[in-house]
Amino acid sequence: MVAGNNSSSHDAKDPSAGAEQIRSAITHLASARDLGELGTRIASVVLLSSPNDIQQMRRNFYEKIRNVTPEYRDCLEKKITEHLLGTWQTLRLMQQQGAFSAMNEPVPAGVNVYWEMVAVQCRGDGDELRLRFLKFLIAGFCMFVRNEPGHPAGTPFPGGGMVQYIDGVYYCPVKEKANDVDAALCPFCPALQTPAIGYLQPPLNPGLHQKQEFIRNCHDFHNFNG
């Protein structure tokens, strides 16, 4: 599945290839020394897929949420589809333009723990496994290379909350509520927990002191782990 590992794109998309190629890809990803290497290696795997694969992911996702309310389902499906297709295109453009070569920052802490989690979640075989790995690759690119949430700003959650981007900070209403879920992205996501409604609200257009005070208060009173 990874360029240079003697696995062709046909192998990567062959359901029989299964977990062995994924394990090889994860080992390659985990050895990346900086963000540029990580981005290049993620792109080399993701771009073996196509927009058709993204559409299949969308169809699979729709089946999972078909029983929720139509308003919530349609909003969520639209946002996730935009995110998946947009991230695939971003990876393609960054790879074509050589953008990763200028990214010399070290990989963030927690990257290897993330790939260990992905390895556990991507055991088995079949096309469903390949698409599951693709989902984790896209999320890893967003969280570690782009320093963006695994779920984009505007993603709605049950109860009316959504991921928000306010004054340079991402907030998520479920950041601290899913850490017991084995496959949750929350422990690795750079978003902060959305403050309780009516208690702490992000200041609009704050100065540096206000922003630092808000983040400090969020940490002290809400035990942020982002």
Can you say where each PLM-predicted feature lies in the sequence?
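N-terminal acidic, proline/glycine-rich, low-complexity intrinsically disordered segments
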Residues: 1-7
